[in-house]
């Protein structure tokens, strides 16, 4: 406690008054009461003989006042306190004068007039201001993550993550799901991304892998008869980091027996509606739209479409038979595709240089050019307009183009390249443009994926999702004859252009699983070594089953409007998969390496 004879902070304080109320809970009904607050100095200022500071804890902020006239010693002490110093304050709650009410704070109608104050912990010079962390370099924020986490925006994000996790558990428990933990140390398998591996001390030369997902174990739980399983599973993938990826992440993992694709999708829609309603008060639609993989590619140029941005790719093959533009004519003559993207009201918004920047995006996706037109004055101008003289009205009619619209085109003999390149331009425009629907949550299911995709580098078929997904029934007889035409019983859930969840109906038959192994080039010996325990389990009355996994980090990122999943994880890794906070990963000393029978060559 500070008085005229109390020294400045002198080591750890054990005996201090514990809080009687949280900072953010004070209201007018508390006026006249004596309270004790515990928290941090958020901001401070002085007006002559009166000093003010905002005191903060997880619940919010309240203003504290110390007057030199009332307590000269305490006033002197407050002027020496640094921001983010940890305090205990005892004082009287008083009503603010009407002219001093702060409507930006929930506590803005009151203030606490301090009588005593304890410094519980001093604060060093701050590497950045906690209330202004957006201007700090990310690695500095990660190095001092405990300070970054004090900011209101990070406190709100981490608290929302907790509410989301709680809502998930509540909903799934109500629906009869059982939360079961699966192993963290598993065998390495030859699919997916690179594994993180852990050497075994007791079995020299052998290694555990950290799970990329609980896939095989949740299928075994279905064989075991648990029927409905879920887990907020910690997963690990050794892949290059980017904004929406981390080497360690959390999955909302579900598996169900005796279900169809529609059953799984319905449960997940209901779960998300419950989560959004209870955690952020948002009502989602009663039905999520669906697109086939082919439709998504044709209309959006991607299997992860952002449905908030209304313009879609349009079929413009007719332009190869109108006008005199040779590149379009040649593409159509060779059976290729022309796709158009009409941007309403953007004719005057993009300079030639900006359009060239968009063209570089299309070229990065194998397109040769990005062609353009502007609809003005009832006709067309700029770009390739001169090649369509006399047919401007027909072009505009077929593409529903209005005056002041910007029209972008990609033409290519390869239909997929045509769509993907223009889809990439569309995605870039979404990132750069401000549009009215940006704050919405727009879900879409993508279904009917190819079961396999061709890997030209290794000259073999790869599973499009993973090798435990079932083909659709009509392809069972012809799997080996034409793998490229086989559609899987697969489904992805996309939110605002991000893959939020991925799932499938699983294989539950030993012979079908072996056929899939063979198609993807897994020889019987390796398949038996890596997955024999699964195919063996299928011999003992395995039920039909299916499931899905959501990215919890990505879900919370999108719910909070964050730029990266690093902003919704308490202690994330940076883009190099390292932690500036504790210098992880670290070097092992020789004794540890010897115990593990390892030699490091760097």
UniProtKB/Swiss-Prot annotation:
GO CC annotation: cytoplasm
Query: What Pfam families does this protein's entry cite?
Result: GAD, tRNA-synt_2, tRNA_anti-codon
Ordered alphabetically, the record's keywords are: Aminoacyl-tRNA synthetase, ATP-binding, Cytoplasm, Ligase, Nucleotide-binding, Protein biosynthesis
Going by the entry's taxonomy, the superkingdom of the source organism is recorded as: Bacteria
Instruction: Tell me the protein family, please.
Output: Belongs to the class-II aminoacyl-tRNA synthetase family. Type 1 subfamily.
- What EC number(s) does the entry state? 6.1.1.23
Q: Where in the cell is it found?
A: Cytoplasm
> What name does this protein carry?
Aspartate--tRNA(Asp/Asn) ligase
Q: Which GO terms describe its molecular function?
A: aspartate-tRNA ligase activity; aspartate-tRNA(Asn) ligase activity; ATP binding; nucleic acid binding
Q: Which organism is it from?
A: Treponema pallidum (strain Nichols)
List the top taxonomic levels of the source. Bacteria, Pseudomonadati, Spirochaetota, Spirochaetia, Spirochaetales
């Amino acid at each position: 406690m500070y008085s005229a004879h109390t020294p400045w902070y002198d080591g750890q304080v054990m005996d201090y008054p514990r809080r009687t109320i949280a900072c953010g809970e004070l209201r007018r009904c508390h006026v006249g009461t004596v309270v004790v607050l515990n928290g941090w100095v958020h901001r401070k200022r002085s007006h002559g003989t009166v000093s003010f500071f905002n005191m903060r804890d997880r619940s919010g902020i309240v203003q504290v006042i110390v007057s030199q006239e009332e307590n000269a010693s305490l006033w002197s002490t407050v002027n020496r306190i640094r921001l983010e110093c940890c305090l205990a304050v005892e004082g009287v709650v008083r009503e603010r004068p009407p002219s001093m009410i702060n409507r930006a704070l929930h506590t803005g109608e009151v203030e606490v007039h301090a009588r005593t104050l304890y410094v519980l912990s001093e604060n060093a010079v701050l590497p950045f201001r906690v209330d202004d962390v957006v201007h700090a370099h990310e690695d500095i924020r990660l190095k001092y993550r405990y300070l970054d986490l004090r900011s209101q925006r990070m406190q709100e994000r981490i608290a929302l993550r907790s509410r989301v996790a709680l809502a998930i558990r509540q909903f799934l428990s109500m629906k009869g799901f059982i939360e079961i933990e699966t192993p963290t140390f598993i065998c390495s398998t030859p699919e997916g991304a690179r594994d993180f591996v852990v050497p075994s001390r007791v079995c020299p030369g052998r290694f555990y892998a950290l799970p990329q997902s609980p896939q095989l174990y949740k299928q075994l739980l279905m064989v075991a008869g648990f029927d409905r399983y879920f887990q907020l599973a910690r997963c690990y993938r050794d892949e290059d980091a980017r904004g929406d990826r981390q080497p360690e992440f959390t999955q909302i993992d579900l598996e169900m027996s005796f279900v169809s694709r529609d059953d799984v999708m319905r449960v997940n829609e209901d779960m998300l509606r419950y989560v959004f309603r209870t955690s952020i008060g948002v009502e989602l639609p009663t039905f999520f739209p669906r697109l086939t993989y082919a439709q998504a590619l044709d209309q959006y140029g991607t299997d992860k479409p952002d449905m908030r941005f209304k313009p879609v790719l349009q079929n413009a093959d007719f332009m190869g038979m109108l006008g005199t533009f040779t590149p379009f004519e040649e593409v159509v003559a060779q059976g290729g595709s022309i796709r158009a993207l009409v941007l309403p009201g953007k004719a005057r918004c993009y300079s030639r240089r900006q359009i060239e920047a968009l063209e570089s995006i299309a070229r990065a996706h194998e397109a040769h050019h990005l062609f353009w037109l502007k609809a003005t004055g009832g006709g067309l101008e700029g770009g390739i307009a001169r090649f369509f003289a006399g047919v401007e009205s027909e072009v505009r009619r077929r593409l529903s183009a209005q005056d002041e619209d910007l029209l972008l085109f990609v033409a290519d003999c390869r239909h997929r390249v045509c769509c993907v390149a223009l889809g990439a331009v569309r995605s870039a425009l979404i990132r750069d443009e401000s549009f009215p629907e940006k704050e919405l949550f727009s879900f879409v299911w993508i279904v009917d994926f190819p079961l396999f995709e061709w890997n030209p580098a290794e000259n073999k078929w790869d599973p499009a999702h993973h090798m435990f997904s079932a083909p659709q029934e009509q392809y069972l007889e012809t799997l080996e004859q034409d793998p490229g035409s086989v559609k899987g019983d697969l489904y992805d859930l996309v939110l605002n252009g991000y893959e939020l969840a991925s799932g499938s109906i699983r294989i539950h038959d030993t012979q079908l699983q072996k056929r899939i192994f063979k198609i993807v080039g897994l020889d019987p010996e390796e398949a038996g070594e890596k997955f024999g325990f699964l195919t063996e389990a299928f011999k003992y009355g395995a039920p039909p089953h299916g499931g899905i996994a959501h990215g919890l980090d990505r879900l919370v990122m999108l719910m909070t409007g964050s730029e990266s999943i690093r902003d919704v994880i308490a202690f994330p890794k940076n883009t190099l998969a390292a932690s500036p906070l504790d210098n992880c990963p670290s070097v092992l000393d020789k004794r540890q390496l010897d115990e593990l029978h390892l030699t490091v060559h760097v």
